[in-house]
Amino acid sequence: MRNFILLFVAALFVGCASSGVQVTTDDEKSQAIKAAYDGYLANDFSASNELYSDDTAIYINSVESISSEENLAAFSSHHDFYSDISMSNGGVDGAYIQTSVYGGELGTWTHAWFIWKGTGNASGNTFEVPCHVAYQWGDDGKVAQTWFFSDQSNHLKELAAAGVEL
């Protein structure tokens, strides 16, 4: 009986052990990304400017990085080509944002999933695009790299309708 009790207590402690990955949605990093998204929707990039360092690598559907200045200029231009820009997830306004602390070499990542929606000013078409963005945080508390994944085909069509040569 004593061995059974010891085995039960040992199993209880092992069962309660942390998996090593900690996931949160209301932490400081998730809130910083949410503030940047709220700013994007209002065409105000001051919160975004606070996220990036001078050497942040940003990848948009590519293995070739762009600078944070190029990234912010591209996202700001959305307001030139679209109206009624919104982000939602599962019918809820805003993006779903979570931060995962992996530890070791993997570090801390914040992920965002959302449906981007906007009406093209040139075409009048409304587009909905599923998006996933992953932000890796550096030791300095700034975003070290960003990976943005979405289908850009509708955006390219809208740019063509607006007469932009690519």
Give a label for each model feature.
Residues 1-5:
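Positively charged n-region of N-terminal signal peptides that target proteins for export
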Residues 16-46, 50, 165-166:
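Short, low-complexity N-terminal intrinsically disordered segments enriched in polar/charged residues
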Residues 20-24, 123-126, 154-163:
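A short acidic/glycine-rich loop-to-helix N-cap element
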Residues 52, 62, 114-116, 133, ...:
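A mature extracytoplasmic/lumenal domain signature
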Residues 107-142:
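Exposed beta-sheet edge and beta->alpha loop/turn motif
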Residues 142-166:
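Low-complexity, intrinsically disordered terminal/linker segments enriched in charged
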